[in-house]
Regions:
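Positively charged n-region of N-terminal signal peptides that target proteins for export
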Residues: 1-5
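Glycine-rich nucleotide phosphate-binding loop and flanking beta-alpha elements
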Residues: 51
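Short hydrophobic beta-strand that contains or immediately precedes a catalytic carboxylate
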Residues: 43-48, 66
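Short, surface-exposed ligand- or partner-binding patches at beta-edge/loop junctions that are enriched
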Residues: 113
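Bacterial N-terminal signal peptides
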Residues: 7-15
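Rhodanese-like catalytic fold shared by cysteine-dependent sulfurtransferases
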Residues: 18-40, 54-109, 119-181
Length: 181
């Protein structure tokens, strides 16, 4: 009986831990509303590499650009036809600094945004949760959104995401918010 009870407690603990570490998504519109209504109480970060922002666009609604992954231009994969991307070793420390600058702590709501939401948005949110931050979400479909499956825009990132939701963005980058190592 003790073994069964112990097994159940361990299983429940592992399930609870797994659930606690899965970041939840929010829409661009929900994020915009939160930044307007409670902007002093949340930290909204763009986790894209700054060069990517330079070519795709930026929203000044974010508090800061803190890349989760940084492009390593010295390592190129011929097979994938892409440069390597490594986790920014200063990511957590930079998020802590951004929270401190707003007078917030690790219990404050943090929202991350990447290009599509899945490759760095959700992983960066989960990375923060695994490191002691308690309330982290990511923007579903990110800044640029998903590719259209059909029609004249087929293959272009013209569906959902911050850019396609009618929210403010620009090709201009706020120099006070862009990441500089």
């Amino acid at each position: 009986m003790k073994t069964l009870l112990l097994s159940l407690l361990i299983t429940f603990g592992l399930v609870f831990q797994a659930q606690a570490q899965e970041a939840l998504s929010v829409t661009p519109e929900e994020t915009w509303k939160m930044t307007q209504e409670q902007g002093d109480e949340i930290l909204f970060i763009d986790v894209r590499d700054p060069v990517e922002i330079m070519f795709i666009g930026f929203t000044d609604a974010v508090d800061a650009n803190i890349p989760f992954k940084l492009v390593d231009r010295a390592r190129f994969s011929e097979e994938k036809a892409k440069f390597a991307m490594d986790t920014n070793p200063d990511f957590v420390a930079d998020v802590d600094k951004a929270l401190e600058a707003k007078g917030l702590d690790r219990d404050a709501l943090i929202i991350t945004m990447c290009r599509s939401g899945s490759s760095r948005g959700k992983p960066s949110a989960e990375y923060l949760l695994e490191r002691g931050f308690t309330n982290v979400k990511y923007i579903d479909h990110g800044f640029q959104g998903s590719s259209a499956k059909e029609g004249r825009l087929k293959g272009l990132r013209a569906v959902n995401g911050w850019q396609n939701s009618g929210l403010p963005w620009s090709m201009d980058i706020n120099p006070d918010k862009i990441y500089r190592p």
